[in-house]
Design a protein with these regions (language model features):
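Acidic, His- and aromatic-enriched active-site or binding-groove loops in soluble protein domains
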Residues: 141-166
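Short, conserved phosphate-binding/catalytic loop or strand-edge motifs used
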Residues: 169-175
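C-terminal accessory/tail domains of diverse enzymes
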Residues: 1-89, 93-94, 168, 184-191, ...
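Short, well-ordered, mixed-charge alpha-helical segments that flank or form enzyme active sites
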Residues: 130-137, 185-186
């Protein structure tokens, strides 16, 4: 098979299967020591106790024998440390309603924070760990994370407009949602959610970075200005927006692969567009075995399993779209991100019509350009506030209609977003107004 056929089988063929409209939710949370640097022993102890309390089975261990991933066979829920022992992730197994997700999430976080509080630590709802300057920058010492660390550190060597935070994954946290999608709905869904991305920046910004004070959400900056962003097709938006499944296939065939496995070892290399990669005889890369070693290998069609993009909206190999751009939210409002996407998923035609006819797209540019503007701390000096409030309220009302049609009373999770729309506020803006990080950490940790 050629690269296009391989892409089709990996990403498009799963869309043809019958969909059950499940919801997938992943929430990363910074582990914060209110007294200073995070204590790894405190974090791993809380992880171990939660694993035992909820009947999870240890699944992955680091090079020192410390468990960094555990799974519940009954629910499919996963506890893990994401990139570092400062970043805890709860990946909820497939659920049919947000109430199921909320109940399990609250149980897990409530138990873990009760343990952490005894050592003045907490999980909190921030997109950037406030102690990132003093915390341990080391990645989890495991094969996959050793590979990722080596790759991201290449920002020090390769040419590019890279930021200096190669370890951004160790201190940045996101709230990600996966929803089933069909082949027929794929392009329309990508278009609708691409158009609404600028408004998500207004509602969900929660990753303030003092080194970039002009940004309320540093997520785009972290990903796009890292080695992941060498090929624009691996990050950001689908540009131009695809109109057919064939265009999606062509687009993904030009996304870059940067890692694979050989002989049980992860290899990484300078990113290569997949359609070019398969035509190469050999590729030079590196692997970790006590230290990083140079190597060369021959590309194989099976390496498609390692092709991964980090876009605002990603098409996965499981027949889902993953929405990646939202920062972790205050934990008492954790379901707002999933509720927003779930409610709009069945309203894509209406959403497209609403946004295309709005002042936002009549007066401005592409979704990417408008999101950049909406991400700025000085945004309100360049945008008509009343028009923006009205548009946000219209989009949220459409979302509420979509949730009501589901019939599970899930629209209750939108209440914080309606409040944010009224004031054009976000968790980042609240943080800046408060100017008391310990108070914000405690407030955003409350369930």
């Amino acid at each position: 098979m050629n690269s296009r056929e391989i892409i089709f089988e990996r990403f498009i063929a799963p869309l043809k299967k019958k969909r059950c409209n499940y919801i997938g939710i992943e929430i990363e949370m910074p582990l914060v020591n209110l007294n200073g640097k995070t204590d790894k022993a405190v974090c791993t102890d809380a992880f171990a106790r939660a694993t035992e309390r909820f009947g999870f089975m240890p699944r992955k261990f680091d090079d020192d024998g410390v468990c960094h991933e555990a799974v519940c066979d009954d629910t499919g829920d996963v506890f893990s440390f994401d990139c570092s022992y400062n970043n805890f992730e709860i990946s909820l197994g497939r659920v049919r309603t947000l109430h199921e997700a909320q109940a399990r999430f609250r149980d897990y976080v409530g138990f873990i924070n009760n343990i952490l509080s005894k050592n003045n630590h907490t999980l909190t709802g921030l997109g950037v760990n406030p102690n990132y300057k003093i915390n341990d920058y080391n990645f989890v010492p495991s094969p996959r994370y050793r590979m990722l660390e080596g790759y991201l550190k290449k920002c020090r060597i390769w040419n590019g407009p890279f930021h200096p935070f190669f370890g951004f994954g160790t201190f940045s946290s996101a709230s990600q949602v996966q929803l089933d999608v069909t082949e027929d709905d794929l392009c329309e869904t990508i278009e609708a959610f691409s158009l609404v991305e600028p408004l998500k920046a207004v509602l969900f910004a929660n990753s303030y970075l003092p080194e970039k004070p002009e940004l309320l959400c540093a997520r785009d900056y972290f990903w796009e200005r890292s080695p992941h962003g060498i090929n624009p097709k691996n990050v950001g938006f689908f540009e131009p927006l695809p109109k057919t499944v064939g265009e999606v296939t062509d687009y993904l065939s030009k996304a870059s692969i940067f890692c694979t496995e050989r002989g049980g070892k992860y290899l990484f290399f300078y990113p290569i567009p997949f359609d070019e990669y398969l035509g190469l005889d050999t590729v030079g890369g590196e692997y970790y075995d006590g230290e990083y070693h140079a190597c060369s290998f021959a590309p194989e069609a099976e390496d498609i399993a390692y092709l991964r993009t980090y876009k605002q909206i990603d098409l996965t190999s499981r027949g889902t779209l993953e929405f990646r751009s939202a920062c972790t939210q205050p934990l008492g409002e954790a379901m707002t991100v999933a509720a927003f996407h779930l409610g709009l998923k069945g309203q894509t035609k209406e959403l497209i019509a609403l946004l295309k006819n709005s002042f936002l797209y009549r007066e401005s540019g592409s979704p990417a350009q408008i999101r950049q503007k909406m991400n700025r701390a000085d945004r309100l000096s360049t945008v008509d506030e009343e028009k923006l409030k009205a548009l946000l309220t219209d989009v949220l009302s459409l979302c509420r209609d979509g949730l009501r049609e589901r019939g599970y009373s899930e629209e209750i999770y939108l209440s914080p977003l309606f409040e944010r729309a009224k004031t054009l506020s976000s968790p980042s803006r609240r943080l800046l107004r408060q100017n008391d990080i310990k108070k914000i950490v405690r407030e955003y940790a409350c369930l």
